[in-house]
């Protein structure tokens, strides 16, 4: 495979030397290279190489400016129809240029230009089953995915994909989060993504059921970073993370824990052929590249919303953190505040359905809000029997087939969107629910906010009415853990570098007295979160009622 002439002579020479060095390394490791392909980014600085050894085992590496930042790493998976872990043969690859533009109502930039190179590598396993390995190279990172071809159902038994990270001159550091909290705050049965960030050394195990995506590797301080995550996950697959016990610098893909979602749902993904696995995303560069990259969105499918004029980001008053949901009268005070200060939304959180004559009360609040130029959003439990918090209601209304009826009803009232909580699992059945909610919400023009949920996986490009995800150790932990707990100033910087780098983050910022009392955060730090943390809906967590002695009115 030759590098396209558009990269110029220097890029071709560097890419050729990288491929030669990679092939020699494969030979020295005892796996004689018999086939190789190379794909370069448009600027020629970033390359991903794939080789097959004598046993038909595939591996890849990634280099930037001639420096290897992901060493020889395993590829492949085993399903009931395919075995791509050995005995694989490659056919002639095809390459195409990527040049796309799209607009986003949320995120790091509203106008996006996607330039990249894509290579499709046809494969056959030892039994003749056909598949493809699809590679992408962009200036800010690379990605790859498997495309299983054929007919009938295929269940994926294991995925061998790994990321072999080199140890830098001063020791590679790993910024990550445990997927779950063990027997502490978030048990494995409750799912994860809400634990505080941790800094580990390369190869150090994590005492939970995996490293949550995204995980950031600092190979050279201030200069060379590798961030690993996923994109374009659909109902054909499950959510994944990195195994809790790396093999030196090799970090492998891990499927969900059986206990997630209260043990309901299958761990192993199963889908009718043909189907694609999610993109395995590797952002490469300095810290600015990591923070500014939109690669997770860029790799996802284009928007399915024909007219996005109803998708309006904004600020939201929200009583749950400071005063619970309370009464309709309390929510009326929050509507008054939002109108007075020009905020676009008010979120009515859990247990609104337990009000006396709840549906009429909500409709009355909608009328009041509309008269003030404010829109309302409603909270829902995602469960269902999978939720670990069945006392938090409304319950069972976000499950098919009743979900569409519920959405049609509240859209008719004039509700602008929904917050759906307590998914508690990355299993395939929950991925189906995530996508089902987004598809149905599109039809009724409802904005969506996912809490107790998985990380952003590029869905915001495909479904731009998905305004934000939680998946962060956010401000609510001052409430849950109490004095002496909750995010520190350092953690908040880490959130911006790690979690917020892959998509909108509903941290629920700007709590004043409780953050100051808990971990000593000055008011200026809390206020800065509203700018530092990107979220399509920014839910301000402190009090916004009529009391002028506390909360935002006091400030």
Locate each region found by the language model.
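Bacterial N-terminal signal peptides that target proteins for export
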Residues: 2-15
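Aromatic- and carboxylate-enriched substrate-binding clefts and catalytic-loop regions
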Residues: 349-517, 522
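N-terminal accessory beta-strand-rich subdomains and adjacent acidic, glycine-rich linkers
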Residues: 27-297
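Catalytic domains of carbohydrate-active enzymes that cleave complex glycans
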Residues: 515, 528-538
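Bacterial N-terminal signal peptides
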Residues: 14-25
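Conserved, mostly hydrophobic/aromatic
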Residues: 146, 338, 421, 448, ...
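An acidic-aromatic substrate-binding cleft motif
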Residues: 272-284, 288-345
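Glycan-recognition and catalytic regions of carbohydrate-active enzymes
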Residues: 121, 540, 545-555
């Amino acid at each position: 495979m030759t590098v396209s002439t558009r990269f110029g002579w220097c890029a071709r020479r560097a890419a050729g030397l990288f491929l030669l060095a990679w092939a020699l390394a494969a030979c020295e490791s005892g796996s004689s290279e018999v086939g190789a392909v190379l794909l370069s980014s448009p600027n020629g600085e970033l390359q991903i190489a794939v080789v097959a050894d004598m046993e038909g085992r595939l591996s890849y590496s990634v280099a930037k400016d001639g420096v290897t930042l992901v060493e020889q790493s395993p590829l492949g998976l085993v399903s009931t129809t395919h075995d791509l872990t050995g005995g694989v043969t490659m056919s002639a690859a095809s390459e195409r240029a990527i040049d796309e533009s799209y607009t986003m109502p949320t995120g790091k930039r509203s106008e996006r230009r996607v330039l990249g190179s894509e290579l499709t590598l046809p494969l056959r396993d030892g039994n003749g089953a056909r598949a493809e390995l699809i590679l992408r190279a962009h200036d800010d990172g690379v990605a790859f995915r498997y495309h299983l071809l054929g007919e009938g159902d295929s269940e994926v038994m294991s995925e061998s994909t790994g990321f072999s990270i080199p140890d830098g001159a001063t020791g590679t550091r790993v910024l990550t989060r445990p997927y779950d909290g063990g027997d502490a705050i978030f048990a494995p049965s409750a799912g994860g993504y809400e634990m505080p960030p941790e800094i580990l050394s390369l190869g150090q195990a994590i005492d939970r059921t995996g490293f949550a995506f995204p995980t950031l590797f600092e190979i050279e301080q201030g200069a060379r970073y590798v961030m690993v995550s996923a994109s374009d996950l659909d109902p054909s697959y499950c959510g994944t993370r990195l195994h809790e016990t790396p093999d030196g610098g090799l970090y492998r893909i891990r499927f969900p824990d059986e206990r997630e979602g209260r043990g309901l749902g299958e761990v192993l993904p199963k889908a009718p052929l043909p189907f694609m696995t999610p993109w395995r995303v590797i952002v490469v560069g300095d810290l600015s590249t990591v923070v500014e990259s939109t690669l997770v969105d860029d790799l996802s499918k284009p928007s399915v919303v024909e007219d996005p004029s109803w998708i309006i980001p904004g600020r939201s008053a929200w009583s749950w953190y400071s005063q619970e949901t309370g009464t309709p009268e309390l929510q009326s005070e929050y509507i008054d505040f939002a109108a007075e200060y020009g905020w676009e939304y008010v979120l009515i959180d859990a247990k609104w359905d337990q009000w006396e004559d709840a549906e009429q009360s909500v409709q009355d609040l909608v009328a009041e809000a509309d008269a003030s130029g404010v829109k309302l959003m409603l909270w829902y439990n995602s469960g269902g029997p999978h939720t670990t918090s069945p006392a938090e209601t409304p319950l069972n209304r976000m499950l098919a087939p009743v979900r569409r009826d519920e959405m049609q009803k509240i859209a008719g009232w004039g509700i602008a969107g929904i917050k759906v909580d307590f998914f508690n699992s990355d299993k395939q059945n929950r991925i189906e629910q995530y996508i089902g909610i987004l598809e149905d919400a599109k039809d009724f023009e409802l904005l969506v906010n996912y809490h107790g949920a998985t990380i952003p996986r590029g869905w915001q490009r495909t479904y731009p009415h998905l305004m934000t995800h939680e998946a962060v150790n956010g401000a609510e932990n001052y409430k849950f853990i109490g004095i002496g707990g909750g995010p520190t100033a350092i953690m908040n910087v880490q959130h911006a570098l790690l979690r917020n780098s892959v998509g909108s983050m509903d941290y629920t910022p700007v709590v004043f007295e409780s953050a100051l009392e808990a971990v000593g955060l000055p008011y200026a730090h809390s206020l800065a979160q509203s700018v530092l943390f990107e979220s399509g809906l920014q839910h301000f967590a402190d009090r916004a009622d009529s009391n002028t002695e506390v909360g935002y009115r006091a400030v």
